Structures are given as structure tokens and as C-alpha cells.
Amino acid sequence: MSHQERIASQRRTTAEVPMHRSTANQSKRSRSPFASTRRRWDDSESSGASLAVESEDYSRYPPREYRASGSRRGLAYGHIDTVVARDSEEEGAGPVDRLPVRGKAGKFKDDPEKGARSSRFTSVNHDAKEECGKVESPPAARCSARRAELSKQNGSSASQISSAEGRAAAKGNNSLERERQNLPARPSRAPVSICGGGENTPKSAEEPVVRPKVRNVATPNCMKPKVFFDTDDDDDVPHSTSRWRDAADAEEAHAEGLARRGRGEAASSSEPRYAEDQDARSEQAKADKVPRRRRTMADPDFWAYTDDYYRYYEEDSDSDKEWMAALRRKYRSREQPQSSSGESWELLPGKEELERQQAGAGSLASAGSNGSGYPEEVQDPSLQEEEQASLEEGEIPWLRYNENESSSEGDNESTHELIQPGMFMLDGNNNLEDDSSVSEDLEVDWSLFDGFADGLGVAEAISYVDPQFLTYMALEERLAQAMETALAHLESLAVDVEVANPPASKESIDALPEILVTEDHGAVGQEMCCPICCSEYVKGEVATELPCHHYFHKPCVSIWLQKSGTCPVCRCMFPPPL
């Protein structure tokens, strides 16, 4: 059987097989300007059914007068079989009335009533086709219709028909593969979900027939229309998404405006509707910015940049970061010469005086903010002369600043005052004494400052050295000397027990001479006191003399010699060795 005979048999078969369509009981709202009335199987009419192929939802390019009428676009509801009907007609596969319901593998469902209903359905679809002709067809449809007209005018031979049917069959197979992947065969304006219904019959052994496009009709119970926005990426329809895009931009701007107003930074990209609303907004913005301006009062030129701030504030930018970054760059570039001019060596004023100067500079800057230049901080020459006159002769400004700083810290730095130079000193016995008790005979080791002075004077050397460091150096020197003396004394007292001299015998102790202290002798052996008990010799006491010619009280030296047979002063052995 040739390809043309197969096509002819297909047309005869599809003409005899009645159409089984599930009627959609629910009505969909159609935005099409054409009538969407169709006939049901029981000779009744219903409006808004899914067979309205001229609906605006299924037309890729509706008339321009309808597009400009103001109706909103972007929603699509309907069955996919209507799109198949148009596609099959545009591609030259045959009239619309040849759309049977396909089962599982190519079997068609039969109906005892064949003729009348099929003819009524064909007439209804032909009416729809005539109305659809009035609508502006898509480019692909126009091209296919133009090709069909040219083929009719030229007399369309059988070979051309067979090639057209082959292309239609190939497109049908591609559409079936896309359908399995949930993709529409032709990307339309509003794709809808495809779901099959009805029972499928097993495949028979009959001869297969080439069918260009056959799809399952979606039943009403499984029909789930999806909502899509119109993308409209073509150049000839530039304003198809303008309405919903404008609405989305308006809502986003409104939400951003509320958020910015909540933090005191509302972007006024559009003017408010009412003047009182604008005044209230400006008052609210001013009230929100009061604490921020108070925090930046340390910067005297803050008010000088308010005009730049509000100029960037009124601009319609994509984000807040752009104008904030630009404002910071502008502010820093104009702040650099001021910071460089303030790096000179000068006296630092007190806190109250600094606040007064900042307040005065801020008022001057705000008064001259309308001009192009910004006033710089210039100290009054009269104030400089007064400050120089207040300095004592030979006083160093750095020392005066340190004094002010230490006095402003108050009692929190009381320990700093306790370790000033000369506050503590060591006496001759390496003991710490208060400076107030020996202020008249204060001795300072000025040799410690020889390395720092270098001929410039001690006062200038002290000004460049931390007083705490100098005090620590002096104290460390005294402590080192005292430690050396103590170690030497301990070494002298360290006596090995094994080599210690044994105690003197009782006979040798009793053999010591006794010297009676009289009034005539005020001193015994030119000594006024006993080295052991450190008490003066008194009239009537008994003293004694060791072979080394050291004098002691007789009872004191007797006790000492009973423990160690040596002189307590010179460590000479007693009794002396023979």
C-alpha cells in the first residue's frame, strides 16, 4: 500500500469513527472578544468551554486593538487538545474534525451513533475556524497557511502532499516525545498541564495507520490548569508585560519605602500624593536624624556636608550603598587637607575649651554650607599668644600636656603619683623613707641622667623620658647595692658547723681578768658600750678583756665563750693556741 493510499484510508476511517470528548461541565472565564459558544452532545449550548480556539489564551499574537483595550494578560486555562487541533490544521494534516480519541496503542473507541454527532461537531469546528481566521495568526501559522495557498495555486502535486505529510508525521513524533517530558510541542503563550484520562484498550494486530498528531483529551476531573506569566520575548510586542511588571515594581517600592522609613532612611524616589504626607515624612526624617547628628558633633564639618547628603538622598539609585559610598568618598577627600593641617606640633586644649571651639566651628560651617568652599579650623592668633604667654619660662609644652592629662584622670591614677621621682628614697641603711620626712636633705643620683641629658639640661632630658622609668632605674640601683651588702654579711656569718671553734673551757673563762668600772673611768678601753649587749658601762659593773684587747661585760662574754671559743668582734680563738 502506497503512502497516498494510506492517507486516504486514514481520512475515511477518521470520518467514520465518532468523536468521544468529555464535556467540561465547569465554565472557564474567557477573555477573548469572540464568542466561545459550542454545542454539546445533547443539543444544548454552553459558553466558555475548552473548544474556543479563538480564545486569547491560545492566540500567540492577539489583535492589537484588543491588546490595547486594557485587559490584563498572563493567565491561561484550557485543554491541550484545542491547541493540537489548530496545529494539525495549520500544518496541513487535515481538517479539525479528524481528531479522534486515541487509546493505548492506536485503537479508536467506537460509538453506535456515528453520523449526526460527527457532522454537528464538524460544523461547530468550522464556525470556530472562520472566527479564528479573523485573529492575527502567529508567524508559524502564517507561514504554513502561505505555503498551503501557494501549493493550491500551483496545483500541489502528490509528491508535495506526501512530503508535507511526512514532515507532519515527524513533527507529531517530536510532539509526542516532548509530551512525555511535560513539554509542549509548540512554545505557546500560556502552556497548560496535560493529563490523560479514560481507559486504554490493548493494541490489536490491525494494520498501523500514519497519524500526524493524536493526543489524549483531558477529562474535567483531572484538568488542572496552571497559571503562567506572559514572558513575551518577541520584539514586535514591547509592552505585553508592562502592566504586571509595573504593579510588581510599585509593590516592591512601597515595601522598601516602609522599611526605609522604619530606620529613618526612606528613599523618596517618587513624590507623595499629598502635601501633608510629604511634610510629615520630612518631619519624621528630621526627628530620626537628630541622635545621629548629636553623635557626630565631634566632627565640626558635619553640617557643611548636609547639602551633599540630601542631594544624594533625593537621587533615585538602585541601592543605598551607592550614594552612601559616594558620600563617604566626597567627605574623606575634603577631610584630608584638614587632617594634614592638624598634624603640626601644638598644644592640645582642654575638654571644655575643645567643645566650645567645636560648637563655634559647627555654627560657622552650617552658616556657610550654601557656598562652594568649606571653612577650615583655624585657631585664633590671639588665643595662641595667650597660651604662649601662660607658659612659664623654660616650660616645655609636652610636660604641660602630661600634667593636664594626669590631673584629669583624677583619683583613678593615684598610684601614678606615688611613684614620681623623689617620692621615695633610700636612707643610708637601705631603708625606704617617705620624701616628706627628709625633704631637707633630699639626695638624688643625678648621674643616672647623664646618658639622657647630653648637654641639654636635666629638665629637658626628663621631659623626653618617662618619670616612672627614671624612678625605677634609681630604685633598682639602690636595691642592687643593698643586696650586695647583705650577701657579704651573710657570707661572713655563714660558719660551717664541722669547722666551728669549740666552746672555751670553764677554767679559761674564770681566769679572765675582772675590771671594776669606777667614776674615774668613763670608758673602758676607749669603748663606751659593750659590743654584745650594746649598753654603756655603768659605775660598779664588772668588765673583762680578751687577749685580742676587746672589752666586754664579764657576764656577757662568759655566756658567749661557753658557746663559741672566739672573740665576738674579731673572731680570734680563745684561749689562743699555744
UniProtKB/Swiss-Prot annotation:
<feature type="modified residue" description="Phosphoserine">
    <location>
        <position position="319"/>
    </location>
</feature>
<feature type="region of interest" description="Disordered">
    <location>
        <begin position="332"/>
        <end position="397"/>
    </location>
</feature>
<dbReference type="GO" id="GO:0061630">
    <property type="term" value="F:ubiquitin protein ligase activity"/>
</dbReference>
<comment type="subunit">
    <text>Binds ubiquitin-conjugating enzymes (E2s). Binds, in vitro and in vivo, the MAGE conserved domain of MAGED1. Binds weakly Necdin, in vitro. Interacts with UBE2D2.</text>
</comment>
<dbReference type="GO" id="GO:0008270">
    <property type="term" value="F:zinc ion binding"/>
</dbReference>
<feature type="compositionally biased region" description="Basic and acidic residues">
    <location>
        <begin position="107"/>
        <end position="116"/>
    </location>
</feature>
<keyword id="KW-0832">Ubl conjugation</keyword>
<keyword id="KW-0479">Metal-binding</keyword>
<dbReference type="Pfam" id="PF13639">
    <property type="entry name" value="zf-RING_2"/>
</dbReference>
<dbReference type="GO" id="GO:0005737">
    <property type="term" value="C:cytoplasm"/>
</dbReference>
<keyword id="KW-0597">Phosphoprotein</keyword>
<keyword id="KW-0863">Zinc-finger</keyword>
<keyword id="KW-0833">Ubl conjugation pathway</keyword>
<feature type="compositionally biased region" description="Basic and acidic residues">
    <location>
        <begin position="243"/>
        <end position="264"/>
    </location>
</feature>
<dbReference type="InterPro" id="IPR001841">
    <property type="entry name" value="Znf_RING"/>
</dbReference>
<dbReference type="GO" id="GO:0030163">
    <property type="term" value="P:protein catabolic process"/>
</dbReference>
<feature type="region of interest" description="Disordered">
    <location>
        <begin position="1"/>
        <end position="298"/>
    </location>
</feature>
<dbReference type="InterPro" id="IPR013083">
    <property type="entry name" value="Znf_RING/FYVE/PHD"/>
</dbReference>
<comment type="function">
    <text>Has E2-dependent E3 ubiquitin-protein ligase activity. Ubiquitinates MAGED1 antigen leading to its subsequent degradation by proteasome. May be involved in protein sorting.</text>
</comment>
<keyword id="KW-0862">Zinc</keyword>
<feature type="compositionally biased region" description="Basic and acidic residues">
    <location>
        <begin position="57"/>
        <end position="67"/>
    </location>
</feature>
<feature type="modified residue" description="Phosphothreonine">
    <location>
        <position position="231"/>
    </location>
</feature>
<feature type="zinc finger region" description="RING-type">
    <location>
        <begin position="530"/>
        <end position="571"/>
    </location>
</feature>
<keyword id="KW-0808">Transferase</keyword>
<feature type="compositionally biased region" description="Polar residues">
    <location>
        <begin position="151"/>
        <end position="163"/>
    </location>
</feature>
<feature type="modified residue" description="Phosphoserine">
    <location>
        <position position="317"/>
    </location>
</feature>
<feature type="compositionally biased region" description="Acidic residues">
    <location>
        <begin position="377"/>
        <end position="395"/>
    </location>
</feature>
<feature type="compositionally biased region" description="Basic and acidic residues">
    <location>
        <begin position="273"/>
        <end position="290"/>
    </location>
</feature>
<feature type="compositionally biased region" description="Low complexity">
    <location>
        <begin position="359"/>
        <end position="373"/>
    </location>
</feature>
<protein>
    <recommendedName>
        <fullName>E3 ubiquitin-protein ligase Praja-1</fullName>
        <ecNumber>2.3.2.27</ecNumber>
    </recommendedName>
</protein>
